[in-house]
Amino acid sequence: VKCRINSSTYRPVISAQLPFRYAVYFCPAPDSNWGLAGAQWLGRCAITGKKDTQPQFSDIDSELFHSITSDPRRYGWHATLKAPFKLVPEHEVGDLLLKMHQLAKSLKPFDLPKLEVSTTGGFLSLRPREVSTPLHAAAAMFVRDLQSFALPLNDAELARRRKAKLTLEQ
């Protein structure tokens, strides 16, 4: 399945969790091949809320599979472009949304290379098998150009992140 990423698929989604944190995620359109595959894998589309029948595997109990996909089923099939952050007091949500929209519109369409299953911090993820310059450039753009909106991490948050032993790329 080919994934074509372009700015026309951009749609901001705000989650009202307290304390407010914001992040930038790429979520495939619910009716795209990627969106349909993700909804089936997780058993639910986070964008539409529509439930889906999860696949059955001979090597894993269906209740166990349903259980281990419960957290991702809630937040959905996505790719993180900028990790969650708290908004600095100098900016309002509207400023952030405007900047996100401008950045998304500046993206040129690109295809992802083949993906492989990987484990990252205890999570299963799909990662490119080879370096994708446009993907890295898009993610770097969101991280770099939205950093002025992010409140610096406090000591406890820094300690938690350091304990996670993130890779240099992360």
Predicted regions span which residues?
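Basic, often amphipathic N-terminal segments
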Residues: 10-120, 137-170
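Short, conserved secondary-structure transition motifs
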Residues: 119-131
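Conserved "landmark" site that anchors the functional core of diverse proteins
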Residues: 134
